[in-house]
Amino acid sequence: GETKEIGLNTRIDDKTTFSAHYFRTDSDNLIAFNNANWKYYNAGAETIKGWDVQLTKAFDDHFSATAAYTHTYIPATSADVNPNRNGYIPKGQYDLTFNYDDTKFNGSLNIKGIVDRPGSKAKEAQVLDTYKSIWTANLALNYKPVKGMNVFFKLNNIFDRMYTDMTSDMRNPGGDGWYSQPGRNFVAGVEYTF
């Protein structure tokens, strides 16, 4: 295969950066899995096209934010399947991150949106819209009271969204091949390095 990319990275001012890229990947020998006989096979060629944009702004010496979007398109291999590997790769992904960084304390809030991922064309009508596009939020906090010590707290999936990153059946939780991500959870601890 071969990947080509063209892009722009620029500093708009002392506190703002912007980037934009277009990419294309051409694969000659894509490997796929046949569910009927449980064997891998050569599925032929595939072309992936996409683009991304990202804007980062520092509001002061401690607080910054980044907004980004990535768009991906993979043509359907036949009339019986959806684009983007039969709808399992999202057409769009949004990322919005807020960061605070001080000498002893830092934290970040990340909001991620996965949009237009309907799953297989054969089962798409049975997929709830809430599974085709999902939004999640995660929070991470770190405090360094002394050199070598880090006290941390992470709150993942703040809004307790039911979703999956990996599935062979988007219809509902508990369906064939549904691998859900953890619900709201937190991790807290202390690290010490020397």
PLM region spans:
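Outer-membrane beta-barrel signature, preferentially recognizing the C-terminal barrel domain
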Residues: 1-19, 24-28, 32-58, 86-92, ...
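Extracytoplasmic loops and strand-loop junctions of Gram-negative outer membrane beta-barrel proteins
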Residues: 1, 33-39, 77-81, 121-127, ...
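Gram-negative outer-membrane beta-barrel transporters
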Residues: 22-26, 42-122, 154, 159-162
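Short amphipathic alpha-helix initiation/capping segments at coil-to-helix junctions
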Residues: 130-135, 142
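C-terminal beta-signal and adjacent terminal beta-strands/loops
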Residues: 65, 113-121, 142-194
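Residues on the lipid-exposed face of transmembrane beta-strands in outer-membrane beta-barrel proteins
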Residues: 6-10, 53-57, 67, 96-100, ...
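Outer-envelope beta-barrel architecture signal
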Residues: 14-16, 61-63, 92-94, 103-109, ...
